[in-house]
Amino acid sequence: MQSRHVPPPQSDAGEDVSGRIEVARAPMPPEPAAPLPINPVLVWIIRLGAYLPNLALFGVMIAVWQFTSSVWLPRIDPQMAVLMPAPTTIVVTAAAMIMSGELLYHLVASLKREATAFVFASAAIPIGMAMGWWRPVYNQMNPIVELLRPIPPLAWIPLSILWFGLGDGQNEFIIFLGMFFPILINTIMGVRNIEPNLVRAARSLGASERRVLTRIVLKGALPQIVTGIRIALGFGWMALVAAELVGANSGLGFLINDARSMLRTDIITVGMLTIGIVGLAIDAGIRALTRRTLLWSLAMAK
């Protein structure tokens, strides 16, 4: 007679007579799949796709320009076709000027004047901090600022020629005027927008006035100051070209004016495009700096 295995009796709690407890084991979770390798070419294509509408519009504009200059205008008015060079002609002229070093020479001269004027215009930062922080200083200086600020920099050209003569000094003075007031006004506004609780907290902890100005006020106003610098560099770049049209023997403005006297519209266009490209590059750099300083200011506020 065969014996039969009989399971031990269990209580309601799941415990058998021998005292053993049976526990159900949960299934092991599956191992996570390895991440797929990122294809850099695919990432580049996706990023490029975001700019396709802009590139398409730019291509259409170039095509219309090329057709107008090389096909339509020569049939309508050959003289006008000479005054409106085709994009292919401009590319050839730009390549020749780059190879000869002429374009680089004038570009460096303009950038040097811009940088020199910016060094002097940066004095607007401490002046603006003083005007924004101390009310008596603001009350004394603001009428003078508001009297001079509406005067366009180009209106100073006759006086600047009499004061400095024709040359770098006159050009840098005009650029300085274009840069100074945007930096000054934005610095004043940045100082006035400082959170008062931060200042009170620093003073309650025993911070000196100099420490409050350098650690709280300056850092808090920095995004607004950088915005003023961005605006100032744009204004200064425009004032630079206008000043070089009148009193300079080098620079992009001089290049354009000299080409005008020779009816070289291709050189004029190359100079104009160079001004636009450099201005775009300067603005892009300042915008990147603005984002960094804004994140820094927000982190400090927290």
Question: For the regions a protein language model found, what residue spans apply to each?
Answer:
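C-terminal transmembrane helix and the adjacent membrane-cytosol boundary/short C-terminal tail
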Residues: 135, 269-302
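Periplasmic/extracellular loop-to-transmembrane helix junction in inner-membrane transport proteins
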Residues: 37-47, 71-120
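Transmembrane alpha-helices
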Residues: 173, 177, 209-243, 266-270, ...
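Short cytoplasmic-facing helical segments at TM-TM junctions of multi-pass membrane proteins
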Residues: 143, 186-231, 252, 256
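N-terminal signal-anchor/first transmembrane alpha helix
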Residues: 36-69
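Transmembrane-helix boundary motif in ABC transporter permease subunits
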Residues: 116-145
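Generic hydrophobic transmembrane alpha-helix motif, especially the helices
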Residues: 146-182, 189-190
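Membrane-spanning helices that line or support transport/gating and their immediate boundary helices
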Residues: 67-75, 129, 140-143, 186, ...
